[in-house]
C-alpha cells in the first residue's frame, strides 16, 4: 500500500511525503526509546515478524521517486482514548515514567509538557530518527497541551515563582521543546528540515493583539502553543498551518487566514506552506465541501496559494484523499 501511495503521489506531481511515525507514544520504526506501534501488529511493543521497518522502507521508496520524506511525530500524545491506557507496552515511556503522565478529563494520556524530563524523552526520540534514518525533515503535528481539563499543578509548582501566570508558563515550556527540537535536528543533520503543522488560528484579534480576524479555537489559548513567536524567532524552517476551512466560512475564513500567516512569515526566513483539507473535498458536511463544490473549493485554495509570493506550497491531508477523490 505504501508503494501504491508513493506511485500515486509521484504521478500527481507531489515532491514530499509526510509519514506519521509516532502516532501515540510509539514508533513505526526500530526504536530504543518508544515501543513498536500497535498499528503495525495489533499489539504495542510487538515487532513485525518479518523485520519490516516502515520508515526505512518509506525513505528508500520516496527517494527512488525523487521525493522527500519527512518523519511526522505527535510529541506528547500517549493514547488516543482511555480504552488504550491499559494496552501500553512495558517499554513505553509512560509506563516506565508514570510520574511524567498527564491525563485529561476524557482519560487520554500525554507526556506532561510541563516536565523537563518529558522534553528530554521527545528530543532523544527526534535524535534517534535523524541519526538512524535518511529523513529530509522532522514534522510535528498540532497536538501540544490537551484541550480539555487536566491537572498540572505539581509541575507548575516548581516554576511558579518565575511564571506567576500559569498560561505563560505552559507556553514557555512548549516553546522550549520547539527551540530545542530544532537544535537537536540541526546538530546531527544541518540540512534536515524542522517544521510544525499547527492549528490554523494562532489567536483571534478580538481577544489577543496581533491575532487574525477570526473567532475560533486557537493554538495560543487552547493548546498553549505560541506558533507566531516560533516564526518570529525562526525556531522553524517552515510552518504549515492547518487551514481546514473554506473561503467565506464564518469565524475562520480561508483567505483571511492565509493572508494573516503570509504577513507573519514574510519578514522572516521561515517558509510558509498551507495544510489543505483534502479529506473534506466532496465529502464534507458543509455545503461548501459537498460534491463538486468541495472539489472546486480545494482546487481554488491550491490556486490561491500558488498565486501568493509568500506561500511556498501546500500539503494535502490525508494521503488517500486526492487519489480517492480524483
For the regions a language model picked out, list residue spans one by one.
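Catalytic domains of carbohydrate-active enzymes, especially glycoside hydrolases
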Residues: 6-26
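Glycoside hydrolase catalytic-domain groove-lining segments
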Residues: 164-209, 219-285
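An active-site-proximal structural segment forming one wall of the substrate-binding cleft
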Residues: 9, 61, 110-143
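The substrate-binding groove and active-site-proximal loops of carbohydrate-active enzymes
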Residues: 37-50, 106-120, 163-173, 242-247, ...
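Conserved small/polar residues in nucleotide/adenosyl-binding loops
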Residues: 3-7, 317-324
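Active-site-adjacent "subsite" loops/lids of carbohydrate-active enzymes
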Residues: 76-128
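Aromatic-rich peripheral "rim/lid" segments of glycoside hydrolase catalytic domains that contact
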Residues: 284-297, 319, 323-326
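Aromatic-lined substrate-binding rim segments of carbohydrate-active enzymes
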Residues: 25-73, 166-181, 188
